[in-house]
Amino acid sequence: MVQGEESSWRMERAALPLNQALAYGVQAHAAAAAAPPTCFLDFQPAAASAAYFGFGELEEALIHGGGAASAGGGVDPGVIIKNDVAQAKSAAGYLAGAGTGRPPTLEIFPSWPMRHQQQLHSGNSQSVGSTGTDSSSAQNTMSQMELVSPASSAPRQEVMMVTTDDYSYKPGLAAAPAAAAPPSFQQHHPLPLQLHGGEGGGDHDKRKHGSTRKDGKLVDAKTERRLAQNREAARKSRLRKKAYVQQLETSRIRLQQVEHELQRARSQGLFVGGCSAAGDMSSGAAMFDMEYARWLDDDTKRLAELRGGLQAHLLDGNLGLIVEECMQHYDELFQLKAALARSDVFHLLTGSWATPAERCFFWMGGFRPSELLKILIPQLDPLTEQQLLGICNLQQSSEQAEEALAQGLHQLHQSLADTVAAGTLNDGAAAPNYMNIMAVALEKLASLENFYQQADNLRHQTLHQMRRILTTRQAARCFLSIGEYYSRLRALSNLWASRPRDNFIGTESLSPTATELQALHHQQQNQFAGF
């Protein structure tokens, strides 16, 4: 056992560099000269150096020293003892330096702050200089020397190097040497991690309550919360900005659609009373035109859904939802027209909000219900006898209501014409009863709104009656046929408005067709010249 320890100690000393050995030797001789030992048991080295120097080695050194003295003519035993003490203290200095991973003579650029280095050197000097003078302390130190071995000092060196170089707390590395070393050794020789207990605990608390940024700076918990709040606020701001941009884009598209509808209305030459529609149009009428343009866009989308549902052979439940949406869509149109009738009924009766081809088939500001039923019956085949009977009864009742409304409107027109033509027309506004005539005419015009409301209610009820009579798929084909019919009328109006307008009068080169038309026109004038 003594020979193994001696061989390990000699291997450790052989591994030391020359300058380190000299440095430790000088320190050891200075300490020995300052306090010469009085007996053999008084010069026990520190506990840290006891791992590499034992009683067996001292005895062997004394024996060899005594033999050499007798053989060589006398060597002073005190010199041998002082040399052994110097070697033991140099081993203690080496162990203290090995704990830090770098010897003191080479610590030019330390890898940790200077205050940690000073604490480490002060701790090592205290451990080296604190040697007991009584026998009990010598025995305790001797027992600690026997417990420590080079194999147990290696984990200490690894733990010390990891803690000081990384400057962080590693629970896994610190637990290994603490478990391996006995309690007595831990009491006299605290682990290197405990030397940095003040600073290491602070760093551990900072890491517990904060985090480290990418640039290596430590951020406390309060700053981290503020940074998180700033990131969340920036994310919400980006979402609001995105929604605002989408709203602006939607408004821009809507404005383009309104401008397109107004341009289309002007190109169709809508005139009321010999003036432009834009000049005499009220605010309610302009708002209705914009809402009707939006309604047409939605109607096109719903027609596409109906067509897709019929082609995909959807179930009656899914197809019925689309049909109900179409019915609600028409209800919305009737509500818009009723709101405008209370403010500007003439705008609805003249049909200036519709295309020219649609106005040709208008009856009191809209479609004639009986005529619409005649168009829809061939599109709804096959129909059962009960369905056909219900549609015929609906058509007959619609015709009777239309006739009654037409007669009432005709009587209103006749009464209004008689009221306006009352009195003398040659005097103009200077007539004595002019204001009375205008007041009576205004009262009769107020009843014109009632006629229009009754006609619109008839159209609305006809659509709801058709929905009750027909099945789900028949109702889908019904709404699809109505939408396609008026879509073709609008397309016809656009084609008529975009047709080429040729001037047949005053042209130098006339086509044969134009020449024939002019010749026919002259013949007709000569034929009816006598009339």
Swiss-Prot record:
Residues 116-154 have a biased composition (Polar residues). GO terms for cellular component: nucleus. It comes from the Eukaryota. Keywords: Activator, DNA-binding, Nucleus, Transcription, Transcription regulation. Expression in meristem/developing ligule regions. Residues 248-262 are annotated as: Leucine-zipper. One of its GO terms (biological process) is positive regulation of leaf development. Disulfide bonds: none annotated. GO terms for molecular function: DNA-binding transcription factor activity; sequence-specific DNA binding. Binds DNA as a dimer. This is Transcription factor LG2.
